[in-house]
Amino acid sequence: MQSSTALLFLLLTVTSFTSQVLAHPGSIPTSCCFIMTSKKIPNTLLKSYKRITNNRCTLKAIVFKTRLGKEICADPKKKWVQDATKHLDQKLQTPKP
């Protein structure tokens, strides 16, 4: 009886920890980049960006979202990528009338 009670307690404990880990959305990256664009994207086509820095992704990247909704991975070390992110940051900070 004691061993079955201990086994049940252990099973419930493991189940509760597992559900907490699976319920935590921040532990799993939403996307990773495996291929980076080699071409510069004109600033006029860019709408926003996000940084991929999760340790589970093999490459650090910037994911640009275009005005047409397409997501494109780019190397954050490239000068044009840094310039584009600065441009988008400034554009988002500028108040619209």
Curated annotation (Swiss-Prot):
InterPro entries hit by this protein: Chemokine_b/g/d, Chemokine_CC_CS, Chemokine_IL8-like_dom, Interleukin_8-like_sf
Tissues and organs where the protein is expressed, per its UniProt entry: Expressed constitutively in the thymus. Expression inducible in the lung (type I alveolar epithelial cells), intestine, heart, spleen, kidney.
Entry function: In response to the presence of allergens, this protein directly promotes the accumulation of eosinophils (a prominent feature of allergic inflammatory reactions), but not lymphocytes, macrophages or neutrophils. Binds to CCR3.
Induction (free text): By interferon gamma and lipopolysaccharides (LPS). By interleukin-13 (IL13).
Residues making up the signal peptide according to the UniProt record: 1-23
UniProt-listed PANTHER family: C-C MOTIF CHEMOKINE 13 (PTHR12015:SF147), SMALL INDUCIBLE CYTOKINE A (PTHR12015)
UniProt GO molecular function: CCR3 chemokine receptor binding; chemokine activity; protein dimerization activity
Organism listed in the record: Mus musculus
GO CC terms of this entry: extracellular space
GO BP field: actin filament organization; branching involved in mammary gland duct morphogenesis; chronic inflammatory response; eosinophil chemotaxis; ERK1 and ERK2 cascade; immune response; learning or memory; mammary duct terminal end bud growth
Top-level taxonomy: Eukaryota, Metazoa, Chordata, Craniata, Vertebrata
Gene designation: Ccl11
Keywords, sorted A to Z: Chemotaxis, Cytokine, Disulfide bond, Glycoprotein, Inflammatory response, Secreted, Signal
Family note: Belongs to the intercrine beta (chemokine CC) family.
Disulfide bond residue pairs: C32-C57, C33-C73
Location of the protein in the cell: Secreted
Record protein name field: Eotaxin
Glycosylated residues (UniProt): T94
